[in-house]
Amino acid sequence: MFGYRSNVPKVRLTTDRLVVRLVHDRDAWRLADYYAENRHFLKPWEPVRDESHCYPSGWQARLGMINEFHKQGSAFYFGLFDPDEKEIIGVANFSNVVRGSFHACYLGYSIGQKWQGKGLMFEALTAAIRYMQRTQHIHRIMANYMPHNKRSGDLLARLGFEKEGYAKDYLLIDGQWRDHVLTALTTPDWTPGR
């Protein structure tokens, strides 16, 4: 009679080859597997991660916080799954969502080493960006990449992101302050949400 009812949004997008959905508590082991398998591959592109990133127990508390962000609409953390949702092949995070007169957020993403070069991130981000623009009514999505990360720059350009600037010592990546190219995608036919 008195059951728990979650108000975490249920977002599950499908593409030709993927399921792109918000991560939840039951994904702890999948996320741990993804980060453990790709730890060395992702290291040059990400902030320093502690060991808990590679263990389900480390993801339990993190996912509780992520679910709160989902409820508040302040961030949306997507897992990129194979069609059977057995394995996470990548992640796409829309964070620091601001409404009001800005309606903007930041995009971060990564894909597992064995899945690179197949167009899967383009496929996933096309669906996730469409969701953020049409359902979350985001006008501006900002994404930044290190100048030597040609793959990321090419992906963002293909998605329609435009270069807006260059920031020195912008983010602490792999223990070093790194320069980044600043890009953004705006929604030309933006409409406010209800």
UniProtKB/Swiss-Prot annotation:
Q: Which Pfam families match?
A: Acetyltransf_3
Member of which family? Belongs to the acetyltransferase family. RimJ subfamily.
Xref: InterPro entries: Acyl_CoA_acyltransferase, GNAT_dom, N-acetyltransferase
- Please describe the quaternary structure of this protein: Associates with pre-30S subunits.
Any further remark recorded for this protein: Overexpression suppresses the cold-sensitive phenotype associated with the ribosomal protein uS5 G28D mutation (rpsE).
- Name the domain of life this protein comes from: Bacteria
One BP annotation, GO: maturation of SSU-rRNA
Q: Which gene encodes it?
A: rimJ
**GO CC annotations on file:** cytoplasm; cytosol
Instruction: List the NCBIfam families.
Output: PRK10809.1 (NF008072)
Q: Which reaction does it catalyse?
A: N-terminal L-alanyl-[ribosomal protein uS5] + acetyl-CoA = N-terminal N(alpha)-acetyl-L-alanyl-[ribosomal protein uS5] + CoA + H(+)
- List GO molecular-function terms, semicolon-separated: N-acetyltransferase activity; protein N-terminal-serine acetyltransferase activity; protein-N-terminal-alanine acetyltransferase activity
* Protein name (Swiss-Prot/TrEMBL): [Ribosomal protein uS5]-alanine N-acetyltransferase
Q: What happens when the gene is disrupted?
A: Mutation of the gene impairs the acetylation of the N-terminal alanine of ribosomal protein uS5. Mutant is thermosensitive.
> What PANTHER family does this protein map onto?
[RIBOSOMAL PROTEIN US5]-ALANINE N-ACETYLTRANSFERASE, GNAT FAMILY, PUTATIVE (AFU_ORTHOLOGUE AFUA_3G00765)-RELATED-RELATED
